[in-house]
Amino acid sequence: MIQRRKLLLLPLLTAVVAAGWLTNLSSAHASSTGNVIYHGGPVMAGNMKAYVIFWEPNGSFVSPKFNSLIKRYFRDIGDSGLYANNQQYTQTDSRAPIHAKLAGTFVDASPYPSVPFLQDADIQHEIMHAMSVQGWKPGINHAFFVYTALNEFICAPSLFGGFCSAPNSHLCAYHFGFGTPDGVVLYGAMPYAGNSLTGCFRGSSVSSPNHDIDADAEINLTSHEQMELATDPEGTGWFDTTGFFNGEIGDKCAGVFGPLDATGADVYFNGHPYIVQEEWDNAVSGCVISGP
């Protein structure tokens, strides 16, 4: 077997505060601290509904196929072997994440409230705006992904140091949540990966299986956050003994890819090529691209 390629990033940060939980997608190497452990909270049992928000003000830039490839990923991932890996991570009633689907998309061309740095509160407000416009509802099985454009950066909450996304720091993406009277809102904050391909992917010279390296890099970040939202949506699900700072199933395999084919893909979902990191599999105590 070809040796796995590794992405060199700094350690992932997860923390629980008030009604929220934060995960930074950054890890220098795959963790080797043993299997993940259940901590008594919910998972996204059954079907995850993914809602995608492209926040792209007039005049901003994303790569030509960025939106379409991200939407394709969400249509492809739900029946994949990678998502099936989540089925071993059950909650108290023995139910597990089974499937995921793209439930809705929204493109918002309204200006950012601040340039070039958005705060986490801005991301939360954007989600609430999209929910209001689209009629979307919160819930434990609903995941909202907010994507921003080139040269706009997202800053984590001040309680976590207020660090802003790469190349300003080693933050690449995170998942978080907040409560509303209608239920919990769970989301991934997804800065534009093209802002720092070296810090948040494999560099700019790697082969791009979809001929759009910004989109391929963003999909890799998306996959990491989606699998962690499925198995540890509230910071009380599945993570290892190091804690949820760097012990969720994506963290333990951050930067670990399968062998790449001639196109630069390490996996195919629904016949489409992708380059995404592996995820932790308790059944083999290691990283896999397809579950048990």
Language model regions located:
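Bacterial N-terminal signal peptides that target proteins for export
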Residues: 2-12
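Bacterial N-terminal signal peptides
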Residues: 11-21
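Cleavable N-terminal signal peptides
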Residues: 17, 26-28
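N-terminal carbohydrate-binding/catalytic regions of secreted carbohydrate-active enzymes
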Residues: 29-128
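Structural recognition of the beta-strand scaffold that forms the well-ordered cores
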Residues: 49-54, 83-84, 99, 104, ...
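Solvent-exposed loop/turn segments at secondary-structure junctions
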Residues: 56-61, 150-155, 192-197, 225-228, ...
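Active-site-proximal segments of metallohydrolase catalytic domains
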Residues: 95-178
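Metalloprotease/metallohydrolase-associated module, dominated by Zn2+-dependent proteases
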Residues: 165-216, 232-292
